[in-house]
């Protein structure tokens, strides 16, 4: 009997050892303790207000939701508010400090209504967050820095941003195989559309009608070039579509989807589809008006290629140069720091080179685009580690030349002119697949590069600078906030609060995210206690 009992005990012990595994971590929202018992209600509200201001800046620029959430949580935890909950649904941001045994809950909610892109402010915000998470900025000082950051004017004059938009169109026209006259007309047309868009935005015109007017102008210029100089209008119209698509959230919606924020992803996708419909309406109105005026034109849609599989060195050089030019000019049009211009052009040029190589090897357009996007995400993360520019700047510039503008135009042409719904549906599916490949590829590239942030041997030391790693990503190793040693940042008035710094750890008890950008007009601000 004793022998059987001993055997059963040994068997149970062996089963426990064999089946033992890491328990799933409790969610952050389930924790009811704070880092220090000295945190009062005023400090909590200051920290929550700071985190929601940072989130507003990022979300208004079209940054990924996971990135916004992770950055806001990093900042809150840096000020010992470890029970902060951040939730984003479409354009609504909610930050909350949960109730504890001795403190009431505090919730702040705001809604972001307008969007604006200024990558120089993104770079400043990135550096501010790195200083905060390193334990060197008091909460009052952080608020003062945010005030200065959001009130600072654009670093470039508006005419230079318009020139950047024109250069972006010039590079895209080179990618689409346009002649020199087509490239010049594309640049001029894009500059006109940019100035018109600024005027319409100043008087409060909805984005849908801005897209209608922009697409209409691009189509009419293409028709005029066809009548006067005999130029094929296809490349001009397709270039205009890519330029108009560059400011939309199609790729961002795919990034939200692959990182688990499905509701926000669907909302962004609906917004992108609605604005794409505005582009379609503008093209159709212009084509119908030209037809009613008795002007007959022929659009050779299939004659325009994306130079995915050129067979000669010169077309390859033109394609890579066009991609690099578009990446450089897009950063200028988006008010990016000058130090990020070269890296953005390098990213776009290398992505196009990968696209060409895989196309020549017989890979499909979607697979080639996905692989190139992985490279863009990887390179963007390495650049952000060196703190030369935020990852969003390099990633955006790298993938914009690969937007499915030509597929959208072919779909519109098939539906409206050729009356072939099957062909139009095929092109729409190709455009959607390309957008998904871009979004998922960038996220995967960031995942592959994320171990370099936290010391991957000599390679990690090559790309990683000294000090705390700063912002964490939605992928890779997770970091845990630990008190910074011998750091006592000073604030303006009141009690001084000891900040904390980020230190890598193998724990998996915090959410993950990846990075963001600049401010907007916010409404519906409420605080609930």
UniProtKB/Swiss-Prot annotation:
Catalytic activity: L-threonine(in) + H(+)(out) = L-threonine(out) + H(+)(in)
Transmembrane segments: 88-108, 168-188, 212-232, 234-254, 265-285, 312-332, 344-364, 365-385, 389-409, 428-448
GO biological process, one term: amino acid transport
GO molecular function: transmembrane transporter activity
Keyword Transmembrane helix: yes
Disruption phenotype: Deletion mutant exhibits decreased growth rate compared to wild-type strain in standard culture medium. In addition, the mutant shows decreased survival rate in macrophages. Infected macrophages produce a significantly higher level of TNF-alpha and IL-6 mRNA expression. Knockout of the gene increases the susceptibility to amikacin (AMK).
GO cellular component terms listed in the entry, alphabetical order: cytosol; plasma membrane
Function recorded in the entry: Catalyzes the export of L-threonine and L-serine from the cell to the extracellular environment. Export is dependent on the proton motive force. Required for in vitro growth and survival of bacteria inside macrophages. Increased expression is associated with low-level amikacin (AMK) resistance.
Record keywords: Amino-acid transport, Cell membrane, Membrane, Transmembrane, Transmembrane helix, Transport
Region Disordered, residue ranges: 482-501
Compartment annotation: Cell membrane
The protein, known as: Probable threonine/serine exporter
Record bears the keyword Transmembrane helix: yes
Membrane topology value: Multi-pass membrane protein
Record-stated family: Belongs to the ThrE exporter (TC 2.A.79) family.
InterPro entries hit by this protein: ThrE-like_N, ThrE/Ser_Exporter, ThrE_2
Domain of life, source organism: Bacteria
Signal sequence coordinates: none
